[in-house]
Amino acid sequence: MIYLVSNQKSLFETDAYKELSLSDAIDMIMPHSWIEYDSETAGLDPYTKPLLCTQYGLGEDQIVIDNVTIPIEKLRCVLEDPTKTFLGWNIAFDLRFLYHHRIVPYNVWDGMIAEKILYLGYPPQFHSLALKAAADFYLGIDIDKTVRGQIITQGLTIPVVQYAAGDVMYLTKIKEKQDAELEKKELTKAAEFEMKFTPVIAYMEYCGAKLDPIKWKQKMSRDKEEVNKAEAALNKWVEDYYEEHKSSTEGYIRVSTEEVPIMEEFKLFDSLNNNMSNVKRVQNPQTGLIHYEYDKAFPYVTRNLQGDLFSGFDTCAKCNVNWSSSQQVVPLFEMLGLNCTTIDPKTKVKKKSADIKLIKPQANKCTIVPLYVEYKKAKILVDTFGQKFIDKINPVSGRIHPDYFQLGADTGRLSATNPSLMNLPHDPFTRSCFIADSGYKWISCDYKGQESFLMASIANDVAMLDELVNGSGDLHSLTARIVFTDIPDDTPLSEVKAKYKPLRDAAKGYEFCFNYGGDWNTLMKNYGLTKRRAQEVYDNYMSGFSGLKRYQEFRREDVLDKGYILLNPITKHKAFIYDWDNLCKIDNELGSPEAKYMLGSNGDNYYKTSSQHLRRRLSDSMKQSINYPIQHAGSMCFKLSAIKFFNWLRKNDLLFTVRYCVPVHDEHNVEAPENIAEEVGKILVKCMESGGEPFCTRAHLGADISIEDYWVH
C-alpha cells in the first residue's frame, strides 16, 4: 500500500494511494531497522534546488512524504536514528540534500555500490549499474522511469507520487539477491567497508572547495602565455628547417636519400616516386656509395609576397601548421622520420597519431620532439584547467562541488568529474588558487611516499624495506645505484643525488615502469632505449629487488589461476577479468589439432586473430595484477582514514564546521576554523596513520601536514 503525507489537498484526488498523517507515518517507520529510502528533487544541486519529497519503503508499504509542505527536519528522529540503516540506490545523491538540512544518517546501504563491487573490472557497457537494469536482472521487473523527466518541470504531482513510491518497492528484494552473490564471491566485507565510506564521499561533494577566481584568471593568462611561447618555438623550428633545406623552387625542400652500394642502386631508384622533382644522382667520390637528391613539397610554410596596409611586408616563410590538429602534425612528423603509427586502445586497430606518449620517446630522432612535448603539456593546461572551473562556482555556496565516485576505477580508487579536482597540476601557483574561507585555515595532509611504502610492504622486498625503514628513504637513489653500472656499488646513497643527478632522474621513470609490471620492452617503447640496454637495466633492477620480482611472478600466476585480481586479503575486494570465460574458451579452441594447423599456415585466419587477442588480454591482466593491488591499497588507506576522520567530526559535532574540500589519492584537504585548525590537523594525521596500518603492515606509513590559507601540497 502507498501512503502520502502532504498538506497539498490536490494530491489526494486519486485512489492510487492513501492519506497519512506525519505522526502516523513516523509510527509506521520507527519499528523498522532497514528502510528503503529515496528522494525526488527539483534538480541536482542541493544549494539551489529544493527537496520535493522523500520515500520510505517498509516491505509491503511505501510512504511518500511531501517535503514542500512537510519540512524534512521533522523526520530527523527517523533519519538520525543510529539503529536504522537506509537502503538506497546512488544514495550519496540523496545524502547531499539531507546534509543541506544538517541531517546526517548513521548507516546507509547503496545497492548501486554493491552492484559495482560485484562487477568491479567490467567495462560500463558490459553491466549497467542503473536501478532499472538491476530490477530487470535480479527480479525480472520493469520499473517505469518515464515520469522522471517530468519532475523538474512539474514538481510533485499524482503521477510523481506513484513513481516515487515505485523506487522504494524493490530495493530490499534486489539486496537479497545481491547479498547471495556477495557471499558467493566472498565480497560481503568489501561491501560493508564501502558502505561506511558512502556518507563520507557525499560530505566531500556537499562541502566542495573555494576557488579564488581572480587568481585563477591570472593562472589562465600564464598558461596561455606558455602555449604561445611553445607554439612560437615550434613555428620557428619549422621555419628554420625550411630555410636550411629549401630548394631553388618555392615551397620545396631539398632531400637526400640514404647512401647505398652501386649494386643496390636499383632498389633505391625504385623507392623514388613520380612526385619527386629535380632528381639528381650523386656518387660519393671517397666511398663510391650512391644517393639521390630531389625536391620535395614542403606545405608547412607559406610566404606572403604581397603584404597589406597594416602589417606591411614580411616576405619570410611562416609556419602554417595548426599544432592542435593531428591531421596536420602527423604528415610533418612522418616526413621528419618520426613513427606516428600506433594501436587504438579501444578498437585494437592501427591508426595515425601525434599523441605525446608516442612521440616523446622518439626525441633522439628529431629536435622538434622536445618542443612539441612542451607545447602539448602547455596546451593541456589551457584546454583542461581554464574558464570551466570558474563557471562551476556555485552561486549560493561560492564553491566548486565536483561529482565523486567512490569506485571510479577498477582499483577501487576515487574518480571525479564536473570538474575533477583530483588531477590538478601540482605546481604551487595552481594549487594556491584554492583557498580557505575568511577565518578558516586550509589543512593539507598527505602520506609520505605512500606508493613506495605500499610496494615494499606488499611485495615484502628486503632492499626496499631496509632503505625506507632504516635508511634515508631515497628509493630513487637506490634504484639508480642498482641499475646504472656507472655508479659504484659502495657509493653512499646520500651522495647519489648530488653526484649522479641525471642518472637518478632517469631511474625515477624506470622505477615506475618496472614497479607496475613493465619490462625491458616497455622501457624501449617509453624511453627510447636500445634492446640491449633496456634488458640490462631490467635485469639489474630485478636482481636488486628480488622480493619485488617474486611478488610480480606470483601475481602473474595468481590471476591466470583465478580469473580475477585479489585486491586485498582483508576485505577481499576483487577486480574481475570481465571476459574470463571467453578467454578460457579461446584457449581451449587453440589446443585443437585444427587450430594448431591453422596457426602454422600462411595468412590471417580466425585462430591467429584469436591467439593474438588471447595473448594481448592475458598480458594486460597480468600487468594489472601487479599494479592494481598497490593502487588499491592506497585507496583503502585513504578511505579508512577518511571514515575515521568523518566519524570524529560527527562525534565532536564538527560536521559542517570542518569542511572536506579536496580528496586526492594520497592526500586529504580540509578547511577548519583558525582556532581549532591545529587540533583538527593533529587528528587528521592520526586518522591517516591508523588508516594505513592494516594495508601497510611491514613499514610505518606516516603523513606530512601543512596549515595555510590555501592549498599547498
State where each predicted segment sits.
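Short amphipathic alpha-helices in soluble, non-transmembrane regions
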Residues: 680-688
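Short, contiguous acidic/charged loop-to-helix segments that flank catalytic cores in large enzymes
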Residues: 318, 388-395, 434, 444, ...
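Active-site-proximal helix-loop-helix substrate-binding element of RNase H-like nuclease domains
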Residues: 2-17, 45, 49-183, 191-201, ...
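Function-dense linear segments that define catalytic or interfacial modules
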Residues: 55-60, 64, 403-494
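Conserved catalytic core of nucleic-acid polymerases
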Residues: 199-202, 206, 397, 401-402, ...
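Short acidic, Gly/Ser-rich segments with clustered Asp/Glu that frequently serve as metal-coordination loops
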Residues: 34-47, 447-454
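Conserved "right-hand" nucleotidyltransferase catalytic core of DNA-directed polymerases
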Residues: 1-20, 39-40, 172-429, 439-441, ...
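A short acidic-Thr-Gly-centered motif at the start of a beta-strand
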Residues: 19-33, 77-80, 426-441, 650, ...
